[in-house]
Swiss-Prot record:
Family label: Belongs to the G-protein coupled receptor 3 family. TAS1R subfamily.
Swiss-Prot/TrEMBL keywords: Cell membrane, G-protein coupled receptor, Glycoprotein, Membrane, Receptor, Sensory transduction, Signal, Taste, Transducer, Transmembrane, Transmembrane helix
A Pfam family it matches: NCD3G
Species per Swiss-Prot/TrEMBL record: Canis lupus familiaris
Gene from which this protein is expressed: TAS1R2
Name this polypeptide is given: Taste receptor type 1 member 2
Length: 836
């Protein structure tokens, strides 16, 4: 005997103790093909699953479930409506057998009854492909626990089961539940709708309360998984105690409820997400009212979102705003009248025996109870009711296709597995909604977020938003009446959201609890990338405090219209014109003693580069380019080196004539014969060219932008030769020191040859200004560096023009009597006689 046969054998033993249902028009309707219905008409708070007991529980002893009776009537209405149609199953009558499952207490007995034959036997066979059970399909039950139990039995026979409100995602496993389908979206969609609702109102600090059964644990785990990577934090999560079947509050339960509600009072969170069956919540909400806990937003799961009994506890309006996630309301024409219509009890049929009322097919108080709740049931709309209605129609359409109905149907034997294959294929429109089963066996009907209202003129469960499972999107949130002062949206945040440009500094273990810290200048906050760290701006950009982005810095360089530039340009023009005038004067008096003592033709070797240096001053003004930086780094410094080297060699030559010619006559002779001054200048020029070429190769001539330390909004655009500046001017500095030394040595020479004061002044100014500029540039990067660089350069040029050539021109122009050979000879003779 195989495992499957053994399982059926065990069921057969239990089946023998079960009785046939009592006759009742609400629970039984004969027909050519029967459907089974499992509904919760009565419910114990926590029923016991009687798998190990022979006695079947009597559901009528438990509390009446109004919604369960409402759903049962939907199945009856759908069957009778189909039987009255001529286009669907013509000539075929559907019947039903409906059983009260008492929530989870009475699951096994009904499914065994449905699987049995008309003679109440369930044979043990190896092949059930040609087995015909009492019913062709089962509608229900309503919760995931019961559905799982029933599905394990029905799947052995591939008997179709369509549940209308069991949302557990485990039921999508077709390897374990091949015969199970649903006309309701899964639990993941309920969670997604809740999360999107929380995000819409910026509620990132919530409390989660769950029941201690599988429903509470499963849904809370789904919520925790969904929030693991989100922006919503759970302040705390508590498990509600399971009440006693008689609803008497025990001391332990009372203390537990007091502690939970007290914790709610102390928490800063004001949004409570509650996953629990409705019967567990009565004692909890009584404790909430007793402690006068108010100002909360209650978010209900589908299990109690539209429960009329809880809604009838009108004092709950004082505790806050009630929102819930449930299925979409689809009005069913004629159903409201059918639901409250009392049907006379039919007498038992001759072929049916009235047995003991242990089969849970009676509800003495259903009619009276539903009549009292009829206004709420009518106004709440046919929500879950449509799920039952569409499930019956899905079976009818599948049977219509299987029987090959056109004008009439062939009433042949139908096996459950044949019907199951056809149910998977159905695709029809019912009351404006397309009904078909997806790959996971679900009909993705839209869901709604509802708000509880207690105003008699309004719908008690008013729709405020719609959720579309196919899009996984919550839309059209509107018409919410907040139970707060001035109808303001409640706030439930551990920390208020930071202002733009402020980063979050976490406080504690929750990412929703934080301090807001301003982003410093030069940094910005990119919330989409990282809310907890300010990002530095790129070097060419800047930001102010609390900026969310960086802006490009303004490029600063010497511009022609600036006062400092105009001043330097005027000095340059003065120097250029003065140098040009000096050239003219020296050219006209080239053979005079004054010009010859200044260097003669070598003066023009100084004046021409000096003019070129003045002419290249505009290279310092305007936006730097590669070529302007290259000219400044090469040709300008070469011109200046020529001038310095000429002054130095001239100072050395004068000292040689008066102090070394007599002591070293042969050396002096070589100096004169080999054109020592020109060789000296040429040698230093070659060395300078090597230095400049090395700098050009080692560094780039491209201009670079550096932040201005005085104004971070500015980027100073300048030539990139700062690192090479000291090395580039080292030769010039060495020449200036040598020139200064030789000039100092010649301070006792004849007056007309004594240039110590002027050369010393020029060389001292150049040395100190160059060293100071290099030092300043190494510690400061502002726009002032460029201005000082140009100003010092022009002043050095002016120092040579006026400091070295100025006195000569003054002598030539204003003291012509001293510019004679006789005067110079007398001065030399006087110096010689004085030395002797």
């Amino acid at each position: 005997m195989g495992p499957r046969a053994k399982a059926v054998c065990s069921l057969f033993i239990l089946l023998q103790v079960l009785a046939e249902p009592a006759e009742n028009s609400d629970f039984y309707l004969p027909g050519d093909y029967l459907l089974g219905g499992l509904f919760t008409l009565h419910a114990n708070v926590k029923g016991t699953v009687h798998l190990s007991f022979l006695q079947v529980p009597q559901c009528k002893k438990y509390e009446m479930k109004v919604l369960g009776y409402n759903l049962m009537q939907a199945m009856r209405f759908a069957v009778e409506e189909i039987n009255n149609r001529s286009d669907l199953l013509p000539g075929v009558l559907l019947g039903y057998e409906i059983v009260d499952v008492c929530y989870i207490s009475n699951n096994v007995q009904p499914v065994l009854y449905f699987l049995a034959r008309e003679d109440y036997s369930l044979p043990i066979q190896e092949d059930y492909s040609h087995y015909v059970p009492r019913v062709l399909a089962v509608i229900g039950p309503d919760n995931s626990e019961s559905t799982t139990t029933v599905a394990h039995f029905l799947s052995l026979f591939l008997l179709p089961q369509i549940t209308y409100s069991a949302i557990s995602d485990d039921l999508r496993d077709k390897q374990h539940f091949p015969a199970l389908l649903r006309t309701v979206a899964g639990a993941d969609h309920q969670i997604e709708a809740m999360v999107q609702l929380l995000l819409h109102f910026n509620w990132n600090w919530i409390i989660v309360l769950v029941s201690s059964d599988d429903y509470g644990r499963y849904n809370s785990q789904l919520l925790n998984d969904r929030l693991a990577t989100g922006d919503i934090c759970i302040a705390f999560q508590e498990t509600l105690p399971m009440p006693q079947p008689d609803q008497v509050v025990t001391e332990w339960e009372r203390q537990r409820l007091e502690a939970i509600v007290g914790k709610l009072q102390q928490s800063s969170a004001r949004v409570v997400v509650l996953f629990s069956p409705d019967l567990i919540l009565h004692n909890f909400f009584r404790e909430v009212l007793r402690q006068n806990f108010t100002g909360a937003v209650w978010i209900a799961s589908e299990s109690w979102a539209i429960d009329p009994v809880l809604h009838n506890l009108t004092e709950l309006r004082q505790t806050g705003t009630f929102l819930g996630v449930t299925t979409q309301s689809v009005p069913i024409p004629g159903f409201s009248e059918f639901r409250i219509r009392r049907t006379p009890v039919r007498l038992p049929e001759p072929n049916r025996t009235s047995l003991e009322a242990t089969c849970n097919q009676e509800c003495d108080t259903c009619q009276d109870t539903t009549a009292s709740f009829n206004s709420i049931l009518m106004l709440s709309g046919e929500r879950v009711v449509y799920n039952v209605y569409s499930a019956v129609y899905a079976v009818a359409h599948a049977l219509h296709s299987l029987l090959g109905c056109t004008q009439a149907c062939s009433k042949e034997v139908v096996y459950p597995w044949q019907l199951l294959k056809e149910i998977w294929k159905v695709n029809f429109t019912l009351l404006g909604h397309n009904v078909f089963f997806g790959q996971q066996g679900d009909v993705l009907m839209p869901m709604e977020v509802i708000q509880w209202q207690w105003d008699l003129s309004q719908n008690p469960f008013q729709s405020i938003a719609s959720y579309y499972p196919k899009l996984r999107q919550l839309k059209a949130i509107h018409n919410i009446s907040w139970h707060t002062a001035n109808n303001t949206i409640p706030v439930s945040m551990c920390s208020k959201d930071c202002h733009p440009g402020q980063r979050k500094k976490p406080v504690g273990i929750h990412s929703c609890c934080f301090e807001c810290i301003d982003c410093l200048p030069g940094t910005f906050l990119n919330r989409t990338a990282d809310e907890f760290d300010c990002q530095p701006c790129p070097s060419y950009e800047w930001s102010h405090r609390n900026d969310t982005s960086c802006f490009k810095r303004r490029l600063a360089f010497l511009e022609w219209h600036e006062p400092s530039t105009i001043f330097v340009v005027m000095l340059t023009i003065l120097g250029f014109l003065s140098t040009l005038a000096i050239m003219v004067i020296f050219w006209r008096h080239l053979h005079t003693p004054v010009v010859r003592s200044a260097g003669g033709p070598m003066c023009f070797l100084m004046l021409v580069p000096l003019l070129l240096a003045y002419a290249m001053v505009p290279m310092y003004i305007g936006q730097p380019t590669f070529f302007s930086c290259l000219w400044r780094q090469t040709f300008f410094t070469l011109c200046f080196t020529i001038c310095i080297s000429c002054i130095t060699v001239r100072s050395f030559q004068i000292v040689c004539i008066f102090k070394m010619a007599r002591r070293l006559p042969r050396a002096y002779g070589y100096w004169v014969r080999c054109h020592g001054p020109y060789v000296f200048v040429a040698s230093f020029m070659v060395l300078k060219v090597v230095i400049v070429a090395g700098n050009v190769l080692a560094t780039t001539a491209n201009p670079t932008a550096r932040p201005d330390p005085d104004d971070p909004n500015i980027m100073v655009l300048s030539c990139n030769y700062r690192r090479a500046l000291l090395f580039n001017t080292s030769l010039d500095l060495l020449l200036s020191v040598a020139g200064f030394s030789f000039a100092y040595m010649g301070k006792e020479l004849p007056t007309n040859y004594n240039e110590a004061k002027f050369i010393t002044l020029c060389m001292t100014f150049y040395f100190t200004s160059s060293v100071s500029l290099c030092t300043f540039m190494s510690v400061y990067d502002g726009v002032l560096v460029t201005i000082l660089d140009l100003l010092i350069t022009v002043l050095n040029l002016l120092g040579i023009s006026f400091g070295y050539f100025g006195p000569k021109c003054y002598m030539v122009l204003f003291y012509p009597e001293r510019n004679t050979q006789v005067y110079f000879s007398s001065m030399i003779q006087g110096y010689t006689m004085g030395k002797d």
